[in-house]
Each structure stands twice: as C-alpha cells, then as structure tokens.
Amino acid sequence: MFNPSLFKSLPALAGLILGIASMMTTPASADALKDELAPTGKLRVAIAISPAGGAFWSTKTESGGYAGVPVDLGKEMAAQLGVPVEYVAHNNSGQIVDAVSKGTWDVTFLPKDPEREGKMSFGPIYEVADATYIVKPGSAVTNFQTLDQAGIKVAAVNNTTTMRGAIAHLKNAKVTGYQTYDEIAGLLTSGEIDAFALSRDQLNAMSKKIPGTRVLDETFKQTVTAVAVPPNHPQALAFAARFLTEAITNGTLRKAYDSNGLKDTPIRTQTK
C-alpha cells in the first residue's frame, strides 16, 4: 500500500546518504591529492635564486634558508595541504623547466610562455612584469634603437622567457645566455657585455648596486608569472589554481609581496 509520508521523506533520506558518502570519500580524495601533489610526503617547491628577490625570484638568507614571494606562497600551500614544505633551489627558471621531467619538484611559480606550456601545466597568473635592458657603466646606448646595433653584446639568463623575448626583439645585437644572475652582473660591471635583459624591477635593483649603469625606459616584452605543476597532474593543478585564486583575493599574495620588499608593487594579473 502506498505510504505518502514515506515518499515525502525520500529527499531527506537521499541527502543523508549523499552526506555520508561525502564523508566517506573526502579522506580518500584528500589522500589521492596528496599522492599526486606531494608524493614524497612533502610539498617540493621549485624556486630560482638571485641576489634581489621579487615576485618570481627568491633569495638565500644568511641563516641558509630562503626568502621570497614563491617561498611564502609555497609555505602556505603546504600548510593548506597538510604536509611539510621543502624548497628545491635552481639558478634560473630554465633549470626549473628542465627538471620537470626528472620529478624533483611538485609545484613552482615561474614565468610562462608557449614553449613552457607544452612542458607543464599552468594555473592563474599572479604577476605581469615589464622586460627591458640595463646598459653597462659609461654606455652611449640610450634607447632600443641605439642598443640594436651590430657588435652590441646583450646577456640574458639562459633558456628563459626573457631571453627568448630578447632574441625575437633584437635584430642586430647578439643575445647570449648565461646560467646565473651573478655571472651576468659581473660581466656588466667589468664591461664585457653591453646590456642585460631582465624584468624592470630586477634591473632597477641591480642599477643601485652597480654605479653608472642605466635601465632603459622602453619595454620590449611583458612577462607573466603563474603557478605551475608537472603535466598530467589534474588534481594538483586544480588545487594549485584554487589556492592561487584565493591567495589573490584574500590578501595572502599581498602579504607575501609586502613581506618581501614589494609594498609599492601592485598586483598585476592581466597584460595590457
């Protein structure tokens, strides 16, 4: 015999079943996420080291640790995931890309371009940086036109988005890649190179340390920096994308900027 009261209770019963199922599957889902994003039990965050930190670059502290926006973001992401954080230091972003196939890191924050999008999976952009050039002390170069001349030697950090941008931009000057920021700074100081291509914020910091150098006013490329994970890690990408989106809106990213000497730097998530 049909019982109307039983029929009315079905939605509540269904909700109860779904709730129980959710409670049962959530731990398994969390374990699956950790297995994919932190397979060693730690969140291994790939960072690149330079003397001047920034939204992408990190620095090594006197105590032997690391500081920088990616360092702070990685620490917070690990806390949300519920695992310890471990930093995997590299000389530049190109080395981070080269290491993706070796499985030595789980997440990173680095500049992206079409070439890199074929090697790893990117989430949201959190920085847009203007790339330009700094010229050596005593240089007669004043703009891009006088820079792009035969015989002019321009340095860039090897295998980076900025290096590829400089090669595309300069038709006559020769662009050569070097492994480290420090090596290029030494060549610029000694006058062995004429210019160095990098983001404006990094070059402004460099100009204060190397007297006589000048940062050109023009911009040849906008470099976008985003969170990234190794390819074919859909759960890791979804978690990283959600984390960064929330970090942009809830003040976590702003706090990381402010704590790393970027209080006057606006957060830019879109190119012009």
Where are each of the predicted segments found?
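Short loop->beta-strand "edge-of-pocket" segments that line small-molecule binding or catalytic clefts
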Residues: 41-49, 64-67, 145-159, 174
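Extracytoplasmic small-molecule ligand-binding "clamshell" domains
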Residues: 31-111
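Short helix-initiation/N-cap motifs at beta->coil->alpha
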Residues: 71, 86-98, 142, 176-186, ...
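A ligand-binding cleft/hinge motif common to bilobed small-molecule-binding domains
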Residues: 94, 111-119, 165, 189-221
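Extended ligand-binding regions for polar small-molecule ligands
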Residues: 68-80, 145, 159-160, 204, ...
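Ligand-binding clefts/hinges and TM-proximal coupling segments of bilobed small-molecule sensing domains
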Residues: 32, 161-176, 215-216, 245-272
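Periplasmic-binding protein-like
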Residues: 128-138, 200, 204-245, 263-272
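Acidic, polar ligand-binding/catalytic clefts
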Residues: 75, 79, 84-148, 214
